[in-house]
Amino acid sequence: MSKIWILLLLVGAVQFARGFPALEEEQEDDVIDWPSFEYDLSDEERGKGLDWLKKQWGKLKNSFKKVGAKVTATFNKGRDYLKKKGIKVDPLNCQGNKCRSCVIFTLKPKKFCIEYVFSTSAITVSLIKEKDDEEKVLLGPFTIKTGNIPKCCKLGSFIGELCLQGVEGRLKSSNGKPHVNLCVGLLLKKFGCGAKICVSYVDGKFSVSFKPKLFAGDEENGTIMEAGEKEDEGKVIDAVPE
């Protein structure tokens, strides 16, 4: 693909993003209100649609960069915890634009769940603790807007501080079809571990929820950072599905 075509693709994505109305702070409607779109697959994309999307999204991934000693130490702590399989995240269970996923600590059995309501450029979140088949709302519901700095809150001495950040990615194909990914970055600062939970919005409706991605991570300069393969490298969390 030529550089000119890539530039045109990105310009189209920006123009598409500007066409979406902003979500008002006081809006409490849980019903998605995004426009409907024409969605006609070409013969090429019928056979290779998923591969094509993965390739295009891959070009929009954030790049890894060097991080400082403090962040590197947190990354290493997270890597060690993940190697022990001390934490896992359930796949999203969705009904319409309302989804739920649970974070499970395996070394010291504890579990809390997060409920998401995905809406235009924002995600409404509730935190729920599960114990002995009983649920207790810890926080929320509250709204995180995509593109904003993380919202952080303390959840007790064991879990510590939890940070949530909304990110989105928008893409147009050569036929003008919009593909939008909405993701929530979840960071457990005490453990140096995070998760990225994403859904895809295509043809005027939610179509795909992706398997949550666990990563070693930290917060730096007002954003959640995801550790790379190299010890001292990380990247700003993005909305590219894995």
From Swiss-Prot:
Residues 1-19 form the signal peptide. Residues 20-46 form a propeptide. Keywords: Disulfide bond, Secreted, Signal, Toxin. It is found in: Secreted. Contains 5 disulfide bonds. Expressed by the venom gland (posterior main gland) (at protein level). Its main location: secreted. One of its GO terms (molecular function) is toxin activity. One of its GO terms (cellular component) is extracellular region. Highly abundant protein that may be responsible for the observed disruption of sensory neuron membranes, since it is homologous to proteins such as trialysin, which forms pores in lipid bilayers. Probable insecticidal toxin. Belongs to the redulysin-like family. This is Venom redulysin 2. It comes from Platymeris rhadamanthus (Red spot assassin bug).
